[in-house]
């Protein structure tokens, strides 16, 4: 008998997701059958494992008495952490990939910090004039997922293919194209949770409202005066889903010792619920595509 180990991976199960009984029933059946087959493989000492890759937002709309046990016993949640600066494991991943493209003799002599300083600017200025580190600038425009970071860096390379580092100008110039990518990503993820009409009208509302930060009462007033333009929207539900998918976060200010400091919470960074009493804030990575500044 062969000593080889085999792994069968099912990916892209969320393609064309619809929040409908037949879709959910098929996914539930696939999860349960996979669990049974993997258990059988283990008992028979078969060196094979089946892995299903599924988004959490889809898993949590599935209802079945066996799913909680399967989640506890047999699932692994891929989490790249909440850190959005140079200490993020995402930047460790990027630096590892950069090392692989370097001369081995040179690469061995460089620390991660050395590579970071050589290839990225120390800081960038935001539209409000704040000075922040380049890792924080880049990661703040992502959902802290590898594909977001890699896509952003690839767009930067496309803008300045001859440069051996990521310049401030290229990072900022690539932001609009990257924002278009992120916008398409989030629209695809919202499919099945909202109709196509709801998705289009919801983003149209944000775009026409033209505010990156606002209270519920403000957008409600704007919406109520223009309901004929957004006939498919339930505003409360739209904001809840936009919060759950990271399109919007909450923002609040704390005053201490005569100084004010703003805080932000987004669902992709913390396990938080929407707070309609706090301000809403549009995700940085979507603002260019929505023409919000």
Regions found by a protein language model. Name each.
Residues 122-293:
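C-terminal leucine-rich, beta-strand-based interaction scaffolds used for sensing/assembly
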Residues 2-7, 12-127:
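The catalytic "switch" region of P-loop NTPases
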